[in-house]
């Protein structure tokens, strides 16, 4: 299959005109997590065919005893059945001329048991001979909010510009859910499991040219064709940032990956070398992945790696400086004119007008400092990006006072972000108090709505900024 044909085929997979759910539950409710309920709740506009041997109707839709008895064409069939009958269901799909089968069903080669391996091979044989394309088995399938497709009813219906390709179903659900909470929304997500047919390479090749997608992320345990994967990723990174978690690189992780999705993982050294050559941004976990995605969705590109830091707490400022330097960012001295301006704005006791800047500890005065201080830092030719951190749990007194003062400070940051010539990054340390966590979430959402990137701590922020810059430096070299 040519690259063009492959992309066309994947596009059709994300745009099925009809879906059959084999194993649809007869007792499904609108508010349930059943596959039919999800499609209805998410507003899928195509035809839905519940398949159930005993039910005549499910959620107001006519049910059928088998795929073969559906009167019209079927683009996608979701297998929600015990693995031991999956070969029979695939034979029905083959006879019906189904285009794509999504095997949510698990119990195949990932178990390491002979029965599961043999059955997977048989399902694969039937599908290949009939030309049925397969997602899975052992996977969650598709999440495409714009098209009404989802593998979780509680996930956001709002579309974004980030795509995620995941070998793991749980990782796909967790990433979307956590991303939604952090103001990150998705164009298309696929969980592909054991990948007996379609794998990450197929989906990434399509997403690299997808106009809805600006950033691509992936969780990968292993690949079938390393040469093709490398070529596709190398092409992708010249068009869009590609952030990846490579799992299964330790001895224990390799063993776990083999039992999870039945793949061969490869050594850390091989994958690290590949990521560097191809321009892939490698991360260790879902949290780091979302941190980097946050930068690509919300951060304007700085002209360099020099950071101006503003935050309460001298020790926090020192640690923030160390964190920056450790990941390849710089925290330079301000120009004399900047220094003079900041000294006029900041009182002497318990503060610092040097980089990192520590303004007055009273949060109520921060809005005033931001108004002039950030403008001065913005004009300093020694600085490329400004990072301000607010530790909410160190402020005593009534939570209403904290909220009012923080509201004022964030108001100023939002207004200034549209005036400053350099990117602004906000860190909100929520701390351990339930009250401050609630305030932090509220202010985070205000910042995100205004297009300001927000992080829960300085470490996450500076690592993300550095990786963001590394990708753009890679592009500067290869394009």
What do these predicted ranges mean?
Residues 1-479:
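Catalytic-core regions of core metabolic enzymes
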């Amino acid at each position: 299959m040519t690259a063009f044909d492959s992309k066309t085929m994947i596009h059709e997979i994300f745009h099925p005109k009809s879906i059959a759910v084999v194993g649809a539950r007869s007792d499904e409710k609108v508010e349930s997590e059943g596959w039919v309920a999800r499609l209805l709740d998410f507003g899928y506009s195509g035809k839905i065919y519940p398949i159930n041997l005993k039910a005549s109707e499910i959620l107001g839709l006519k049910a059928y005893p088998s795929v073969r008895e559906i009167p019209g064409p079927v683009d996608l069939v979701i297998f929600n059945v015990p693995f031991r009958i999956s070969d029979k269901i695939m034979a029905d799909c083959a006879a019906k001329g189904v285009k794509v089968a999504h095997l949510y069903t698990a119990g195949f080669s990932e178990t390491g048991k002979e029965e599961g391996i043999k059955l997977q091979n048989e399902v694969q044989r039937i599908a290949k001979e009939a030309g049925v394309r397969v997602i899975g088995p052992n996977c969650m399938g598709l999440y495409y909010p714009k098209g009404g497709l989802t593998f979780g009813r509680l996930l956001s219906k709002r579309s974004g510009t980030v795509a995620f390709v995941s070998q793991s179903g749980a990782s796909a659900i967790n990433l979307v859910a956590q991303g939604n909470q952090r103001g990150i929304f998705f164009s298309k997500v696929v969980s592909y499991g054991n990948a007996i047919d379609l794998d990450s390479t197929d989906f990434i090749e399509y997403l690299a040219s997808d106009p809805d997608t600006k950033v691509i992320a992936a969780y990968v345990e292993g690949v079938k064709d390393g040469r093709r994967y490398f070529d596709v990723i190398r092409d992708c990174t010249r068009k869009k940032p590609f952030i990846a978690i490579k799992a299964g690189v330790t001895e224990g992780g390799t063993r776990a990956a083999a039992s999870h999705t039945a793949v061969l993982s490869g050594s850390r050294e091989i994958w690290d070398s590949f990521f560097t050559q191809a321009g892939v941004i490698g991360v260790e976990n879902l949290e780091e992945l979302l941190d980097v995605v946050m930068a690509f969705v919300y951060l304007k590109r700085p002209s360099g790696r020099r950071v101006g830091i503003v935050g309460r707490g001298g020790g926090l400022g020192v640690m923030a400086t160390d964190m920056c330097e450790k990941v390849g960012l710089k925290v330079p001295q301000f120009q004399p004119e900047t220094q003079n301006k900041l000294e006029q704005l900041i009182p002497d006791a318990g503060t610092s007008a040097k980089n990192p800047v520590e303004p007055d500890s009273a949060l109520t005065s921060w809005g005033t400092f931001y108004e002039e201080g950030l403008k001065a830092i913005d004009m300093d030719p020694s600085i490329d990006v400004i990072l301000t951190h607010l530790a909410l749990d160190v402020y005593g007194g009534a939570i209403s006072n904290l909220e009012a003062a923080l509201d004022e400070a964030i108001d100023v940051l939002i207004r200034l972000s549209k005036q400053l010539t350099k990117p602004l990054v906000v860190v909100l340390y929520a701390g351990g108090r339930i009250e401050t966590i609630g305030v932090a979430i509220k202010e985070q959402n205000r910042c995100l709505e205004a297009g300001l990137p927000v992080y829960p701590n300085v470490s996450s922020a500076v690592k993300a900024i550095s990786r963001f810059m590394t990708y753009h430096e890679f592009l500067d070299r290869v394009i």
